[in-house]
């Protein structure tokens, strides 16, 4: 399994509201249960975050992280999300995350962004646009939904 992880998940590790599910998600990534896909868009956003959040990226063994750079094709798809009203220009970076994850065919984009990403109606919009332009559909989930259950 490979999961594109947006910036909200990295920050969720240290957030009381989200850490209950984010910490186990990253622990399982460290164990190699899945590969985390990290884009240059995410890295750029993390550089503006508190240092402790950026340092979390180095806690994942490199063999379980795939680094990707945004392509012209992905930028064009992100632009289409905005042009067709799925997102406003203010949230173009969210459109970029979704476009990258769509085109590289990850198993899921993982996010805590309920307004723009983990949102049933918006996912329908993204997938409609993806299909219109012959791109794969995208699955978007929270860390809670993709973390393996542990027996207690």
Predicted feature locations:
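Acidic, PIN/NYN-like endoribonuclease modules and their adjacent C-terminal/linker elements
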Residues: 1, 15, 43-44, 104-152
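Residue-level detector of alpha-helical recognition elements and their boundaries
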Residues: 22, 61, 93, 116, ...
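Active-site neighborhoods of divalent-metal-dependent phosphate/nucleic-acid chemistry enzymes
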Residues: 66-125, 147
């Amino acid at each position: 399994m490979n999961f594109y992880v947006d910036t909200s998940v990295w920050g969720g590790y240290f957030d009381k509201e989200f850490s209950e599910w984010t910490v186990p998600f990253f622990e399982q990534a460290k164990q190699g249960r899945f590969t985390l896909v990290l884009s240059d868009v995410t890295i750029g956003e993390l550089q503006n975050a508190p240092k402790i959040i950026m340092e979390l990226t180095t806690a994942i063994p490199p063999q379980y992280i795939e680094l990707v750079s945004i392509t012209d094709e992905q930028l064009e798809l992100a632009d289409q999300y905005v042009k067709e009203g799925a997102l406003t220009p203010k949230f173009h970076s969210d459109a970029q995350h979704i476009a990258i994850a769509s085109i590289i065919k990850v198993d899921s984009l993982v996010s805590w962004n309920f307004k723009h990403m983990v949102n049933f109606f918006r996912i329908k919009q993204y997938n409609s646009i993806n299909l219109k332009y012959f791109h794969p559909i995208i699955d978007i989930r929270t860390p809670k939904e993709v973390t393996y259950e542990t027996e207690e």
